[in-house]
From Swiss-Prot:
Subcellular localization, as worded in the UniProt entry: Cell membrane
Taxonomic source organism: Physcomitrium patens (Spreading-leaved earth moss)
Name of the molecule in the record: CASP-like protein UU6
Keyword flag Transferase: no
Residues in compartment: Extracellular: 226-253, 298-342
Length: 373
């Protein structure tokens, strides 16, 4: 095992003594093998896993040099440090059989025989920070992110446009995954995946508004196309009076103009609703402003379309009944012209019904806003 000497004490001094627990021994006369024998006897008497024997000097400076030999898991030797009384603190340095330096059983610095230094942190060989997420560092040095567990929730709110929209969010939640063994390789670590999704689904009110806007657009377009294509040749008793067109009637021109305006407005509202449902972005950020603007324009264009449709319906009726006994459709053989005009007026009235339904939905949304605010 070797000889234990105190460099501060002269071995030739006959006054230096060593205490083995039973009496004083002259340090100058003690052989190293004798000290080893005393240590073994002390270990047997104490019943501990090592030997503790102090060496005292008579220099009068109240210093005690303590050395202990302890057989640990790797047969290590604990060498105490020179301390001054009355401090009770004592630091041990464990030297393993590999001639390295190891501090602590659960973590510290391990120095191998080759001289390299390794960090040992816990039984899992990594750093775990919190249960909800953190960083796990394996023995090879790679960083493993925690696994992700998907969660979802739904929310219904008043949208920025005509319809109610249900927004469904799908997000991710981080959870800590501890390796099964301390020797788990980096390839065994779970691959992190993050997914963020945002979906919007139409509610019943939203579906109705979507359908009404689409109907307004289609019906107005049909009324415009049919009325613009309305024309016929005026003939009676072999006499040709020329071609009869829709622009010869002021009511029909007014009907076409109003339907063009309604078509543009309904197309804009339809695109805004479609854009909001698919991308989640509205042209007007404020719900309050958007709802009141929609209600106002719906009312305006509803009155315009209703007046144009009724005016055109009056002219179409007079074409059959005649004015002052003159029936235009039957006398001048322009039946195709009158039929097309009737179809255009009918489509315009259907557009009025669709616009009226959108206005009722706008009133409902205003009532919801007033109740919330």
């Amino acid at each position: 095992m070797g000889t234990l000497t105190d460099p501060t004490v002269d071995p030739a001094d006959p006054h230096v003594k060593a205490d083995d627990g039973a009496g004083l021994i002259d340090a100058g006369q003690v052989h190293p093998e004798r000290l080893e024998t005393l240590a073994e006897d002390q270990s047997q008497r104490d019943g501990a896993n090592g030997v503790h024997f102090p060496v005292k000097t008579n220099t009068g400076n109240a210093a005690e040099s303590t050395a202990s030999t302890e057989n640990g898991e790797t047969g290590s030797i604990d060498v105490g440090k020179l301390r001054t009384k009355p401090s009770p603190v004592q630091t041990h340095i464990h030297r393993g059989g590999s001639e390295g330096l190891y501090r602590g059983a659960s973590g510290g610095i391990y120095r191998s025989a080759s001289g390299s230094t390794h960090i040992h942190r816990g039984a899992s060989g990594g750093i775990l920070r919190g249960q909800s997420g953190g960083i796990h560092r394996g023995r090879s040095g790679a960083i493993h992110l925690p696994s992700l567990q998907s969660i979802s929730f739904s929310m219904t709110r008043l949208p920025e446009e005509d319809a109610g929209v249900m927004m469904h969010f799908t997000e991710t939640k981080e959870t800590e995954t501890t390796p099964e063994s301390s020797r788990a390789s980096d390839e065994d670590a779970p691959t992190p995946k993050k997914k963020h999704r945002l979906r919007k689904h139409l509610t019943a009110i939203g579906a109705y508004s979507f359908a009404f806007r689409f109907s307004e657009t289609v019906l107005s377009l049909i009324a415009i196309v049919v009325m613009c294509s309305t024309r016929g040749s005026m003939r009676t008793d072999g006499v040709d009076f020329g071609t009869l067109k829709f622009n010869h009637f002021q009511a029909y021109r007014y009907l076409v103009a109003v339907n063009v305006i309604v078509f543009v407005y309904s197309t804009f509202q339809f695109i805004q609703l479609l854009y909001t449902v698919i991308l989640g972005i509205s042209f007007i950020p404020s719900i309050f402003i958007s709802t009141w603007m929609t209600f106002g324009f719906d009312q305006l264009f509803l009155y315009l379309l209703l007046s144009a449709s009724t005016s055109a319906a009056t002219v179409a009726n007079m074409s059959y009944t005649g004015e002052m006994g003159i029936q235009l459709c039957s006398r001048f053989d322009v039946g195709s012209f009158c039929s097309k005009a009737d179809v255009a007026v009918t489509m315009s009235f259907f557009a009025v019904l669709a616009m009226l339904s959108s206005t009722i939905l706008a009133i409902y949304r205003i009532a919801v806003l007033l109740r919330e605010y």
